[in-house]
A protein has these predicted regions:
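Conserved N-terminal phosphate-binding loop of PLP-dependent enzymes in the Aspartate aminotransferase
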Residues: 1-213
Length: 213
C-alpha cells in the first residue's frame, strides 16, 4: 500500500502541497507502515530552488519518480527509492525499454554536474523571487485579469480571470511560450539558467498582453 502525491501539482494548476501536509502524510505512512511516494517529475531537479521540492518540507519519501529536468530536454527518467524499498526490486520486477541508454546517462550526469555547481540553486532561488515579485506587481496592476500568482521556485502558475486560451495565444504572438494547466492557469517554466534580462523581457510581454484585454 502507498500514498502517492505530486509535491507540486503541475497539470492540476501549479498547486504547492503545504509543508505541514507533507509532514503529516509522512507521519501517517510511517504509522500505518505504508509507502510515501512523492512525484517530482515536474518539480524536481532544482526547479523549486532545491534539488527536490520535498526538501522545503524536510520530509523523506520512500519512492521518488523523476524525469524531465534530469535529462535537460533529453528523454530520461528514473525511480529513486530507499535501500529498504529497493530490496523488493529484484531483477525483472522493474525495467525500462530505454533504461540505461548511454547517451541519456551521459546527459543526466552533465545535468547533475551543473545543478550541483556552487551557487547554482541559490541563483535559482534569487531569480525566482525576483520573477514572483514582478508578477505580483502585474497582478496588483491588473486585478481583473490575474486572480493569483502561485508556485515555488521557477515553477510558477498564473491563474486568470480572462480566457486562458486567448491569453496563451497572445503571449505566443509576442514570442513568449507558456503552457496551460487546470483551473484557467498558465504555467511559466523558464530554464533554470534564465537571466534577469530575460525575466524582464517576459514581464514586459505579460504586461503588454494584460493591457490588450
Amino acid at each position: 500500500a502507498a500514498i502517492m502525491v505530486e509535491t507540486v501539482m503541475g497539470e492540476g494548476g501549479i498547486k504547492v502541497i503545504p509543508p505541514w501536509c507533507l509532514r503529516e502524510l509522512r507521519k501517517i505512512c510511517t504509522k500505518k507502515k505504508i509507502l510515501l511516494i512523492l512525484d517530482e517529475v515536474q518539480c524536481g531537479i532544482g526547479r523549486s530552488g532545491k534539488f527536490f521540492a520535498f526538501e522545503h518540507a524536510n520530509v523523506k519519501p520512500d519512492i521518488v519518480p523523476i524525469a524531465k529536468g534530469i535529462g535537460g530536454g533529453f528523454p530520461l527518467a528514473a525511480v529513486l527509492m530507499t535501500k529498504k524499498v529497493a530490496k523488493g526490486m529484484i531483477p525483472g520486477t522493474h525495467g525500462s525499454t530505454f533504461g540505461g541508454n548511454p547517451l541519456a546517462m551521459s546527459i543526466g550526469s552533465a545535468v547533475l554536474e551543473q545543478i550541483f555547481k556552487k551557487g547554482f540553486l541559490k541563483n535559482v532561488q534569487n531569480i525566482s523571487k525576483y520573477f514572483n515579485s514582478e508578477l505580483n506587481k502585474i497582478k496588483k496592476g491588473f486585478p481583473y485579469i490575474i486572480k493569483e500568482v502561485r508556485g515555488v521556485g521557477l515553477l510558477i502558475g498564473l491563474q486568470l480571470f480572462k480566457d486562458q486560451t486567448k491569453f496563451i495565444q497572445k503571449l505566443m504572438d509576442n514570442k513568449l511560450l507558456t503552457i496551460r494547466a487546470a483551473e484557467n492557469t498558465i504555467r511559466l517554466l523558464p530554464p533554470l539558467t534564465v537571466k534577469k534580462q530575460e525575466i524582464d523581457l517576459a514581464i514586459k510581454i505579460i504586461k503588454k498582453v494584460c493591457n490588450s484585454f
